[in-house]
Amino acid sequence: MRKTFLAITCASLLSPTFYSQAQEVSADETVVVTANRFKQIDGAVLAQTVTVTKEDIKRLQANSLFDVFRTLPSVEVAQYGGRGQSASIYVRGGSSSQVLVLVDGVRMPRAIMGGIDFNQFPINSVERIDYIRGARASIYGSEAISGVINIITRAPINDDSGRVSAGYGSNNHKKGTFVVSKPVGEGKHFKGVLGYEKTDGFNVKPQPGLNDGDEHGFETLNLKLGYQQNFSDNLSGYVGVSAYNNEYDYDNSSIWSGHEKKTGEVEYVGTDLSLEYNKDVYSSELKLAYGQQDNYDHKSGQNKSTGDHVAIEQFNAIWLNSYSVNEELSIGGGLDYRTEKLAKGYIAPSDRGPAKDYDPEKNPRTNFGVSAIAQYAYDVWTLEASVRNDDNNQFGNNTTWQTAAGWSFYEGYELTLSHGTAFRAPSFVDLYYPGYEMPNLKPEESENTELSLSGAVSIVDWTVTGYYNEIENMLIWEGAGMQNVGEAEIKGVELEVKLDTDIVSHEFYLDYKDPVDKSGAEDTQLAYRSKRGAKWNAYATFDQWTLGSQYLYQGERFNGSTRLPSYSLWNFTASYAVNQNWDINAKLSNAFDKDYEMYVGYVTPGRQYFVSADYRF
């Protein structure tokens, strides 16, 4: 995994001034798309970020986004069992609904509860993952309280590759992928991905005498198609279509209702279209995207029509612009329109009936955002400021802002300081759960301050960051429904170190935080967040071999008065290049068969193996 100062974008807009600079920089410098929505040299970026490349994903031998995210700094992940089960991500102590997840710069349709279940998204189409920490609502709007993750599936227009892979592992885990990414003429490119995966799984929530012998498996079929074309030196376009159909089993047994095994199905279809214009000192992009996610819930073995059905529709229109005033000053701005609605079904299980005062056909949720940013770089100083206003038909106006400064006080060393505000809009369930409707809820709000020092000494690149995040109006369940009565305070320190020792590349991540829930009479630790974490990723390449290891330490966590002990995990990977076309791969996860819990009452995978073969063409 390559650590950079890379930030995230909703789209790939080019600042010509920085582009011309990029032609002259050395190979060690990187031209990146930043949180400012235009391209910059990495040294000009002030946000703390990491990029995961397609090559990194291959070295990890990741079968899911869960496998990737758990290796990132200041990230805690948890899932209700094994592959395909519902999963959550906690960035710097924030909740899953307080991190914004994008796909090719566009928001994923939100789950009914407001968070994104990234365990349902197929990893086989991913080209790169950009991960930024800290408040970015002044650029992106709602949910960007603790961080932003941009999952990029669009291939470079000059990419010429193809791959067929097949693998088998523990719990009868089978996986096959076909990928073609090829130029189809001058300035034209096509990418197609087809994938299938199935595992029998295991009993993720054993209840003796109720569900003995149950297995909770996962199955997915997914497709991704993309075409891009350069119409001229200045104008290019892209159109993409993606779809996946997932099924996962889970346990719904109880001592009151007896044994009940259920199946959840997730069907997603989305399409996006974009046009980019770049000329001299001006760049512009228009992007349109539509997605629908259907969620079915029914008893296992029965047809999906016999259970509950919920569908979320989302449409996005984004127009971004950037202008280089001179070599020191660049400005940018954007308009974002989004509409989302509950297209079918109920917000809650159908036996609760419809919510009061909510007709999804007559009252979709719409949001219009206007943002502006400026960055000034001169001598050893870099300054930036951004502001955004979101006008939402449910909760009204919300204005966020951020300022940052960077001081390169000595060659190879930089000190950065930033302060910004952020918010999260209530979800459909927060507002309209039948019998507990609270249509007047306000957004959660936060203020984040962070100070970073980075340096490069010989073979070592390092960064240490301290942050302080206050969150108010947190949505907490009270007897009558959700209420804006919660408050949290999260303080933390991160250390990132990257170095190469002979043939081995290392990445070390340490974090200490104090995630405090201040909502009650006494301060408590936020649920399922630990205070301490450590990660080590290492890879060695020699001859035809690539060997890897990943170490993860997770500190103790709490859910109310229940304590979940700390744990350590080791994963090992090996890949052998038979020739230029064939690779043989093997992975051993949880190598020492550690017994641990992510959620109370749910079993995690023990020692697991997975072997695969790749053919490249």
From Swiss-Prot:
Residues 40-154 form the TBDR plug domain. Residues 1-22 form the signal peptide. InterPro entries: B12_transptr_BtuB, Plug_dom, Plug_dom_sf, TonB-dep_rcpt-like, TonB-dep_rcpt_b-brl, TonB_box_CS, TonB_rcpt_b-brl_sf. Residues 159-617 form the TBDR beta-barrel domain. SUPFAM superfamilies: Porins (SSF56935). Coiled coil: none annotated. A motif (TonB C-terminal box) lies at residues 600-617. One of its GO terms (biological process) is monoatomic ion transport. It is found in: Cell outer membrane. It is a multi-pass membrane protein. The keyword Cell membrane does not apply. Transmembrane segments: none annotated. HAMAP family: BtuB. PANTHER family: COLICIN I RECEPTOR-RELATED, TONB-DEPENDENT OUTER MEMBRANE RECEPTOR. This is Vitamin B12 transporter BtuB. It comes from Vibrio campbellii (strain ATCC BAA-1116). The gene is btuB.
